[in-house]
C-alpha cells in the first residue's frame, strides 16, 4: 500500500492587507493543502476564508478556514503578519514596542498549543520581531526565520533589471542587513550574467553616483508606496508565500532572510538579513557573503542599530523570554 503523506498545514496569524495577500498567493500557487487563518477580527477572517475558497475551482484544492491557536498544534508552518502597520513618516523601527507586545500575545499561545513546526515572521520590524520570536518561543534557531531582506532584494533586482533591460529574475543581487533604513546592496557581488553592475554602469558612461541612486531608490521604495497608497502588501505578501513554498516543498533554496547570527560577519545574538538555505526542516545553512571593508562596516552599523533598538525595547516592554 502506498504511504499517504500528511497534508501540509499552514497557520497564518494576521488577516490584514499583508496577511490576506499572502493567503491569496498561497491559494493561487497551490502551496499547502490546509490554510488556517487567525485574527482578532474573527468575522472578517470567516469572510476571507469563504472568499479565498471561491478561488479554488480555478486554482488548487485547499481547506481554508478561520482558525484558533489550538489549531497550531499539528501545523508545519506558522506565519506571523499581525502587527500595527507602518504609517506615513514612520520607520519600521518606530513600530517596535507596539508590535513586540502584539508578538508576545501571539507566540505564547502558539507554543502552548504544542506547535513543533517552523515560525516565519513577516511583521515589522522583522529582524527584531524574528529575534524576539526565537527568545519568547524557546525554539531552536533553525525553526525561527524572518522574511528579512527578501522584498528589498526583489526591489533591487527590479530596478537593476529595468536599467539593464533584462528580466529581474536574471539579476543576481542582494540587499543585506536590516529590513529598513540601514540595509545596503552588495555591489562587490551584484551582477547580471557574471558582469558586475558596477562595471556595467561604468561601461555605459555613468559614475558611482548611479549606484548610490539605485540604493536610495530601493531603500526609499516602501516610504514612496506608503505615502501614495497607505501600505505595502503585494510585494511582501508574494515574497512571503515564496519563502513558505521553499520551506514546505523542501527546495533547499537560497533566499535573503532574517536569521540568527552565530559569528557570521562577526555578529552574535541578533537576527539580520543575509542569504540562507531553507528547506523542510527550516534553516539549513547561513551563507556569509565575502564583503569589502566598506560593506562589512555597513553590516556592522546595521547590526548595531538593530541591537540598540532591540535591547531598549525588551527592557521597556518587559516581554518574557525563554532563552
Swiss-Prot record:
Record flagged with keyword GTP-binding: no
Residues engaged in binding NAD(+): 18, 39, 69, 83-84, 105, 122-124, 147
Major enzyme class: oxidoreductase
Gene Ontology biological process terms, A to Z: glycolytic process; lactate metabolic process
Disulfide bonds: none
Keyword rRNA processing carried by entry: no
Oligomer and partners: Homotetramer.
Protein name: L-lactate dehydrogenase 1
Record organism: Lactobacillus acidophilus (strain ATCC 700396 / NCK56 / N2 / NCFM)
Name of the gene this protein is made from: ldh1
Amino acid at each position: 500500500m502506498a504511504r499517504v503523506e500528511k497534508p501540509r498545514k499552514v497557520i497564518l496569524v494576521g488577516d490584514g492587507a499583508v496577511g490576506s495577500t499572502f493567503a491569496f498567493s498561497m491559494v493561487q500557487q497551490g502551496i499547502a493543502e490546509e490554510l488556517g487563518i487567525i485574527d482578532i477580527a474573527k468575522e472578517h477572517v470567516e469572510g476571507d476564508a469563504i472568499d479565498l475558497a471561491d478561488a479554488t475551482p480555478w486554482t488548487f484544492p485547499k481547506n481554508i478556514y478561520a482558525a484558533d491557536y489550538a489549531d497550531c498544534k499539528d501545523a508545519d508552518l506558522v506565519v506571523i503578519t499581525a502587527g500595527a502597520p507602518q504609517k506615513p513618516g514612520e520607520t519600521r523601527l518606530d513600530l517596535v514596542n507596539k508590535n513586540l507586545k502584539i508578538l508576545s500575545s501571539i507566540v505564547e499561545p502558539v507554543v502552548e498549543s504544542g506547535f513543533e513546526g517552523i515560525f516565519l515572521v513577516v511583521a515589522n520590524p522583522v529582524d527584531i520581531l524574528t529575534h524576539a520570536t526565537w527568545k519568547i518561543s524557546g525554539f531552536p534557531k533553525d525553526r525561527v526565520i524572518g522574511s528579512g531582506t527578501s522584498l528589498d532584494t526583489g526591489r533591487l533586482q527590479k530596478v537593476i533589471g529595468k536599467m539593464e533591460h533584462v528580466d529581474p529574475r536574471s539579476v543576481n543581487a542582494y540587499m543585506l542587513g536590516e529590513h529598513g533604513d540601514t540595509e545596503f546592496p552588495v555591489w562587490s557581488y551584484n551582477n547580471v550574467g557574471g558582469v558586475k553592475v558596477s562595471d556595467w554602469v561604468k561601461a555605459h558612461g555613468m559614475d558611482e553616483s548611479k549606484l548610490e541612486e539605485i540604493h536610495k531608490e530601493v531603500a526609499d521604495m516602501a516610504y514612496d508606496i506608503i505615502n501614495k497608497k497607505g501600505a505595502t502588501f503585494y510585494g511582501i505578501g508574494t515574497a512571503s508565500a515564496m519563502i513558505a513554498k521553499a520551506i514546505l516543498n523542501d527546495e533547499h533554496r537560497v533566499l535573503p532572510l532574517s536569521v540568527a547570527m552565530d559569528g557570521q560577519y562577526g555578529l552574535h545574538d541578533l537576527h539580520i538579513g543575509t542569504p540562507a538555505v531553507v528547506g523542510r526542516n527550516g534553516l539549513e545553512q547561513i551563507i556569509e557573503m565575502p564583503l569589502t571593508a566598506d560593506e562589512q562596516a555597513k553590516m556592522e552599523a546595521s547590526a548595531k542599530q538593530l541591537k540598540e533598538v532591540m535591547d531598549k525595547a525588551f527592557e521597556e516592554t518587559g516581554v518574557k523570554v525563554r532563552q
